Amino acid sequence: MKIKTILTPVTCALLISFSAHAANADNYKNVINRTGAPQYMKDYDYDDHQRFNPFFDLGAWHGHLLPDGPNTMGGFPGVALLTEEYINFMASNFDRLTVWQDGKKVDFTLEAYSIPGALVQKLTAKDVQVEMTLRFATPRTSLLETKITSNKPLDLVWDGELLEKLEAKEGKPLSDKTIAGEYPDYQRKISATRDGLKVTFGKVRATWDLLTSGESEYQVHKSLPVQTEINGNRFTSKAHINGSTTLYTTYSHLLTAQEVSKEQMQIRDILARPAFYLTASQQRWEEYLKKGLTNPDATPEQTRVAVKAIETLNGNWRSPGGAVKFNTVTPSVTGRWFSGNQTWPWDTWKQAFAMAHFNPDIAKENIRAVFSWQIQPGDSVRPQDVGFVPDLIAWNLSPERGGDGGNWNERNTKPSLAAWSVMEVYNVTQDKTWVAEMYPKLVAYHDWWLRNRDHNGNGVPEYGATRDKAHNTESGEMLFTVKKGDKEETQSGLNNYARVVEKGQYDSLEIPAQVAASWESGRDDAAVFGFIDKEQLDKYVANGGKRSDWTVKFAENRSQDGTLLGYSLLQESVDQASYMYSDNHYLAEMATILGKPEEAKRYRQLAQQLADYINTCMFDPTTQFYYDVRIEDKPLANGCAGKPIVERGKGPEGWSPLFNGAATQANADAVVKVMLDPKEFNTFVPLGTAALTNPAFGADIYWRGRVWVDQFWFGLKGMERYGYRDDALKLADTFFRHAKGLTADGPIQENYNPLTGAQQGAPNFSWSAAHLYMLYNDFFRKQ
C-alpha cells in the first residue's frame, strides 16, 4: 500500500530552509580538530595510532593538517603519506609560505579552520591579506588556492624540511632512532622541477611499518615560476609578485611509476582550470550534506556529530590501489593497523549501510571491493572455499597469492550481514541492477557458510577457521601450543588436543583456530569464545567454577569426498544464527525483486527455521538471556545441538535476536530487562561488550567490556523493534552525554570505557561513525 503525503507550502518552506542550512559547509567549522605539526614519522598517541587528524578526501593517499600556531602558519603541516598499508608523516612544515615586503617579513595574524571538504587559512596584516583554501581535486592530488591582496610588490618564500626523527608516543620520543637509520633504503630525496619540486622515495618492504615501491613520489607544482634551492632534506622556493595575485599549487602522492605518469595530465588540467576543480569539490560536499542531513528533528549537537561521521567516513575512503581495484573504505586512516586501503567485510557492511545515504557510489564500491576477492571455483590457493569472502584485503597480496603483504588475511571471514547492507543501498537508490549484480555473490557467500561452517548440518552455522598454514599442518592436523611454566610446546591434531584438555596439565593453551574463530565473529577474544584473563579465571575457579567451562572444542569440517574444508568451534553462536536469519530474509526480498519467487519462498522458510531454533535452543529461561549453544555428541531430545553456554556470561550477542527480529516478544521483554539493569549492561556508557556480571569483564578489555558503537546501536534498534523505543532513547542520550569527546572536536573513537566514558582504541573510526550517523538519520527522528 502506498501512502501519499501532502505537504503544505509552509511545511515545504521549512524543509527547504532546513535542507539549505544543513548543506552549507560553512556552518560546520572545526567539527574535527585538524591542527597539528608532527615531529616524528610515527607521531603516535597512547595507543600507537597517529595522534593528529589530517584531512583526506576523494580517496586520496595523502592528507594535510592545519597549522597549530605561528611556526606553522602559511603551510598545511605534516603531510601524511599512505605508504600502501600504513600512514607515516613526511614533514612538519612542507611548502610553508612566508611573505616579505620591502625586505621585512610580514607579521600576520592567523585564522585557520576546517569545513567539510576544505582547509582554510586567513593571514591578515595591515597592508597584506592572504587567504588559502585547500581542497582535493583528484584521488591523488590536492589543490591549494592562495589569494594575496596587496597594493605593493611582495617576495614570496616557501620552505620545507623532511622529518628526521622516527617515533614518539604522546610527544615523547620512544628512541633516538632516525628515519634514515631505521630504513636506510628509503633514500628520500628532494629535487627541483620545472614548476616546483618532488620528493622521491627508495624501495622499502618493511612488512609491518613502511611499504614503498621505489617508484613513489610526492610532487608539488605551482602556477607561477619559482626559484628553488635544495640543501639536503630542506628546500626554499622564491617568487616575486607586483601586487595582488591568486596562485595555485598542487600536491600529489603517487605510489607507482604508472601513477606518476598518469597523473601529470591531470595536474596540468588542474592548474589550467583550478576554479573548475575547486567548485566541483565544493558542490560535491554540498551534495553530501544535502543528502545526508535530512533530519529536522535532530538537535544541533546531534547534527554536528552526523557531520563528523560524514567527514570521518569520507576521510577513510581510499581510491583503487594495488590489489584492491575498487574504491574502498578503511576502518581508520590514522589507525596503526587500519590504514592504507586495508578492507574488512564486517566494517564494510556497516560503512556502506550509512554511506548509502550520502555517498551511495562509494557505498557500492566498498562492497564491490570486498566481493572482488570472493573465492571462485578453481581458485589456486583455496579451491575448497568457493563463495568465501576473505577477512582482510589490502594493497599487497599474501605470499600465497604472489605478494609480500603481511596484513592480507584468509584465515576467516566475517558475520553474514552483507545482504543487510546491500539491501540498504537498494532501499536508498532503488537501483535494481545493483541487486542483480550482488545477488549471486550473496547466494554464494550464504552457501559457503552452510557448506563450510555447519558441522552438524542443522542449518545453524558456527564460527570457525579456514584450512590455513596458521591453523594446521600440511597434512591437515590442527595446531595448538601448550604452555606450562616457562615451557611451551606446539602440538597438532584434534585427538592430541582432546587428550591435553582431559589431562589438564597446562597453564594455558594457544590455539590459532580459536583466535580466527573469534575474528570471524567480529568480536575478537570475546568471553563467549573462551577468552578470559588468568586472574579472572583463577577467581572464577575459586568461586566454584570449572576451568573446563572456558575450554573450547573444535571439529573438522570435510566435504563428501573427505577434503578438509576448515574448522568449526563446537558451539552455535546466537549472533551468527540471528544474522543468518536476516540474511535469509534479505535474500528473499532480493529474489522477489528479481522475479525468483521459488527462491524467495525457500529463503523465507530457512529464516523461520532459524527463528524457531534460536528461541527454542538459545534462550535460557533461568537467566532470561540468549547465549551460544554447545554442540554435544548427540542432539538433545528437543532437537537442540546442546544447552546454552550460560557460564561464560552475558554479552551483546544476547540482543542480536532482537536487532535481527528473530526473538519472540516474551524473550525480547526479558532481554531488555537485562539490558536496562545497572548491574548488567546499563553502565555510565551503556551496552558494553560484556555484562558487569560476566567473569571475563574488564572495562578496558577490547571485546569483554568496552562499548562498541555497532553493538550499542544493534541494542537500541533491537529495543525499538520490540516496543522499547523510549528506553532506548534514554540510553542513546546517556551515550551522547557520557562518551568523552563525542560532541566536542575530538575524532570519533573505536570504542569507549563503559565505566568512565574514556575514549579507547583507534581515532577516526569508520564503523563508529557509521552507527552514529545511523542514530542521527533514523533513530533520532520523531515517530
From Swiss-Prot:
Signal peptide residue numbers: 1-22
Catalytic site positions: 524 (proton donor), 750 (proton acceptor)
Function noted in UniProt: Glucoside hydrolase that cleaves the alpha-1,3-glucosidic linkage in nigerose. Has very low activity towards maltooligosaccharides, soluble starch, nigerotriose, kojibiose and trehalose.
SUPFAM superfamilies assigned to the protein according to its UniProt record, in alphabetical order: Six-hairpin glycosidases
A Gene Ontology term for the protein's cellular component: glucosidase complex
Species of provenance: Escherichia coli (strain K12)
Residue ranges of the region described as A domain: 300-783
Name this polypeptide is given: Glucosidase YgjK
Annotated region described as N-terminal domain, given as residue ranges: 24-254
Residues binding Ca(2+), per UniProt: 454, 456, 458, 460, 462, 572
Family note: Belongs to the glycosyl hydrolase 63 family.
Region called Linker, residue ranges: 254-299
Domain of life (superkingdom): Bacteria
GO biological process, one term: trehalose catabolic process
EC number: 3.2.1.-
Keywords: Calcium, Glycosidase, Hydrolase, Metal-binding, Signal
Group of enzyme by EC: hydrolase
